[in-house]
Curated annotation (Swiss-Prot):
It comes from Sorghum bicolor (Sorghum). This is Fatty acid desaturase DES2. GO terms for cellular component: membrane. The chain crosses the membrane at residues 65-85, 89-109, 122-142, 185-205, 231-251, 254-274. A motif (Histidine box-2) lies at residues 146-150. Keywords: Fatty acid biosynthesis, Fatty acid metabolism, Lipid biosynthesis, Lipid metabolism, Membrane, Oxidoreductase, Transmembrane, Transmembrane helix. A motif (Histidine box-3) lies at residues 321-325. Belongs to the fatty acid desaturase type 1 family. Its main location: membrane. Induction: Up-regulated upon auxin treatment. Up-regulated by jasmonate and methyl jasmonate. CDD domains: Delta12-FADS-like. It is a multi-pass membrane protein. One of its GO terms (molecular function) is oxidoreductase activity, acting on paired donors, with oxidation of a pair of donors resulting in the reduction of molecular oxygen to two molecules of water.
Length: 385
């Protein structure tokens, strides 16, 4: 270790290489109060990284829309003209490609929700509402709950999503699911495919509320009185898109809508759950109760991952999540530079895992079942049966 117990850059690179070669663990994140402040972290980032640009942000929207339009043309004009064997093989390629592109658009809408798209809040909200509604996401509803996630990351009592349970809070059948490879696989598939719509509709994996919580309910416990009117706007956006899909189904057929829109949307949901799950679930990440939690340590209890070529395609939401939690209004096109700038300041407090994503998903589903406290402290770590 370096001076003061800090991991040197060479030691960190060695650890990352070992992880990439198959090592199963990485060093736990420190849980002591950091020897640096948010202000010191911010000073390490070049000032231009915080500058938002309407033109640059819209260039990424145009990029994604052009690719999505080209793929739609491929689905509607080229696939039907292909001979049967190629015809059936081409549809899965379209679904996966279009799902990836639409997830990239989802990320742009997420930027809008953080006011990282432009200097104009109204413009951000209009762009975010249009993009998220087109993907069946209630924009303002999720914007507000997601803002609370950023305000309470790592808190067992107040975080909004992927809140781990203690061992005693799990259902009696949990050991039979997680200790069984088949059960574990089923759990992963269900979580990836149904997790997002269930979270929006019933708050699955979210923090407990005193009554039923739903992102579509303007009067639900997630929102305060100032936010309720915009929840109606979010619902109207989703309903408008739903009505448009209904009219398309009535004109072109139900299965046309499924092939062209619904299956790519399912891929979007899979990416969304996978990326967010892996950002906040790792054996090296702590959680805190009210005795220990503070905002900075909570914001640092996340991990950057390597998705290969998808990092840039997904606007680097995958490999710059730590800096995003520290400065959520920083635009994505500066996040890589900002991450490089803060790593020397964060030292051991910065977590990056290059483990291949499929392997990491299986490992986290096996190792991160519940959390247990350190003796005499309000610090909790993942454990398994």
């Amino acid at each position: 270790m370096g001076a003061g117990g800090k991991m040197t850059e060479q030691e960190r690179e060695k650890q990352e290489q070992q992880l990439a070669r198959g090592a199963s663990t990485m060093q736990r994140s420190p849980v002591e109060k950091p020897p640096f402040t948010v202000g010191q972290i911010k000073k390490a980032i070049p000032p231009h990284c915080f500058q938002r640009s309407v033109l640059k942000s819209f260039s990424y929207v145009v990029r994604d829309l052009v690719i999505a339009a080209a793929l739609l043309y491929f689905a509607l004009a080229i696939i039907p003209a292909l001979p049967s064997p190629l015809h059936y093989a081409a549809w899965p390629l379209y679904w996966i490609a279009q799902g990836c592109v639409c997830f990239a658009m989802w990320v742009i809408a997420h930027e809008c929700g953080h006011h990282a798209f432009s200097d104009y809040q109204l413009l951000d909200d209009i762009v975010g509402l249009v993009l998220h509604s087109s993907l069946m996401v209630p924009y303002f509803s999720w914007k507000y709950s997601h803002r609370r996630h950023h305000s309470n990351t790592g808190s067992l009592e107040r975080d909004e999503v992927f809140v781990p349970k203690t061992k005693g809070a799990l259902a009696w059948y949990a050991p039979y699911v997680y200790n069984n490879p088949v059960g574990r696989l089923v759990h992963i598939v269900v979580q990836l495919t149904l997790g997002w719509p269930l979270y929006l509709a019933t708050n699955v994996s979210g923090r407990p509320y005193p009554r039923f919580a739903c992102h579509y309910d303007p009067y639900g416990p997630i929102y305060n009185d100032r936010e309720r009117a915009q929840i109606f706007v979010s619902d109207a956006g989703v309903m408008a898109v739903s009505f448009g899909l209904y009219k398309l189904a009535a004109t072109l057929g139900f299965w046309w809508v499924v092939r062209v829109y619904a299956v790519p949307l399912l891929i979007v949901n899979v990416w969304l759950v996978l990326v967010t799950y892996l950002h906040h679930t790792h054996p090296a990440l702590p959680h805190y109760d009210s005795r220990e939690w503070d905002w900075l340590r909570g914001a640092l209890s996340t991990v950057d991952r390597d998705y290969g070529v998808f990092n840039r395609f997904f606007h680097n939401i995958t490999d710059t999540h730590v800096v995003h939690h520290l400065f959520s209004t920083l635009p994505h096109f500066h996040a890589t530079e900002a991450t490089k700038a803060i790593k020397p300041i964060l030292g051991e407090y910065y977590q990056f895992d290059p483990t291949p994503i499929a392997k990491a998903t299986w490992r986290e589903a096996r190792e991160c079942i519940f959390v247990e406290p350190e003796e005499g402290r309000g610090v909790f770590w993942y454990n398994k049966f």
